[in-house]
Amino acid sequence: MMLIPMASVMAVTEPKWVSVWSRFLWVTLLSMVLGSLLALLLPLGAVEEQCLAVLKGLYLLRSKPDRAQHAATKCTSPSTELSITSRGATLLVAKTKASPAGKLEARAALNQALEMKRQGKREKAQKLFMHALKMDPDFVDALTEFGIFSEEDKDIIQADYLYTRALTISPYHEKALVNRDRTLPLVEEIDQRYFSIIDSKVKKVMSIPKGNSALRRVMEETYYHHIYHTVAIEGNTLTLSEIRHILETRYAVPGKSLEEQNEVIGMHAAMKYINTTLVSRIGSVTISDVLEIHRRVLGYVDPVEAGRFRTTQVLVGHHIPPHPQDVEKQMQEFVQWLNSEEAMNLHPVEFAALAHYKLVYIHPFIDGNGRTSRLLMNLILMQAGYPPITIRKEQRSDYYHVLEAANEGDVRPFIRFIAKCTETTLDTLLFATTEYSVALPEAQPNHSGFKETLPVKP
C-alpha cells in the first residue's frame, strides 16, 4: 500500500472503505508479527531435561533383556541385500540421459581405459573409466569393466556397487550377473563384521553409568548440535551459538529471520515429544505418531500444513514423489512395513536407515520431510538402545548424493552412510568418557586385504 504525502491530502480524497481496509491490513500484519514473537518467547522445557529424557529412555531399554539381546544378535541373522559398511563407493547418479555424442565419447574412453589397463597404467585407466561413466552413467559395459578393475584392486564394495548398477539398467547382462554373484557374499560378510563392531560400541556406551557427568555434558552438547545440523541441512542460517541462545534464554535473536528461529523451536518441540512420549512406549508406530512429529516440526512455521499430508504434487531434485492422491495409501503401507516382522528382523541401523529413506521417498508433507524422517530414524535407533545420531551439515552433499543413488535403484550406499554417522556418534560419546573407549575395535578394519575407498563423485 502506497502512503500518500501530507501535502497531497487536500488534493486526494480517499474513500472511507479504503481507509477501513487499510487499517484492517495493518492490524492483520501486526498480529502476525506479534504471533511470531510470542512463539519465540513461549516457555521451552530445559534442554537438560530433554537430555535426561533421552538417557532415561536408553537406560529403560536395559530392563528389556529380550529387546537388547535381539538387537545384539541381529547382525548374525540372515541379512537382506541392503548391507551396511563403512566404506564408500563411486556413486553414479544419472542427472540426464547421455547424448549421442556423449555415448560415442564414453565408448572411446572405455576402449582407452582397457588399453591403459592392459599396459599396466592403472591410474590413467581409472581416470578414463570415470570419464566414460561421467559421459554416460548408464553405460553398462563401462560399469561392468570398471567393476572388474575395482575388484582387481580388492575394492570389493565398489565393484559390487558397479555390478549392481549395471544390473539395474540391464538385468540380464551376463558378465555383470556372474561377477555380482561372486562379490555379493563377500560384501555381506564385510558388512556383517561392521554390524558387530557398531554393536560392540553400543554395548560400551550402555555400560557407562547413568550419572556419569561427562556423558551428561556430551549428551547436552549433542542435543544442541543435532538441532543445529538438522535445520542447517535444510538451509537454516542460524549459528550454533544463536540456537543455544534461543533454547537457553527463550528470547529471539535480534536481526535474524523469525521463520528460521521458529524452525528451531519446532525441532525442540518434536524432540521433546519423541523423548518423553515415544521412545519408551510399548507398541506399534502409527501414522498418527508420524503426523504428531511433523505437527511439531512445522507447527511454528506453517501451522496450516503442520501435521497433514500434502495435497499438491511436488518435485524433489530429480525425484518425483507419489501423487498426492496416493500419499495416504503409501503411508499406510509404510507404517505396516514399520511394524512388520521383516523390518523387526533387520539390524537396527539398517531398519532406521530404510525407514528414513522410505519416508523421504514418499515425501508426504509439503515441507519438513527431511527433518521428520531424521527424527523417525532416531526414534527407531533409540528404541533399539542406540543413541540418536546426527547428520552434519558438512555432509549435506554426500547425504543428498546417496539419497539420489537410492532413487536410482541401490539403497545400500545410503544405509552405509547412516551406519558411518552412527559410528561417529558412538565414538563421540566414548571419547568424551575416555575410560570406556579402551580396547574398542577399529571401526574400519581392512578385512581380508580389501582396499578402503572413499566416496568419489564423477
Swiss-Prot record:
Sequence positions that bind ATP: 234, 316-319, 367-374, 399-400, 407
The UniProt record lists the keyword Endoplasmic reticulum: yes
Result, substituting T168A: Does not affect level of auto-AMPylation
Induction statement: Up-regulated in response to activation of unfolded protein response (UPR).
Catalytic machinery residues: H363
MF terms (GO), sorted A to Z: AMPylase activity; ATP binding; Hsp70 protein binding; identical protein binding; protein adenylylhydrolase activity; protein homodimerization activity; protein-folding chaperone binding
Protein's name according to its UniProt entry: Protein adenylyltransferase FICD
Protein source organism: Homo sapiens (Human)
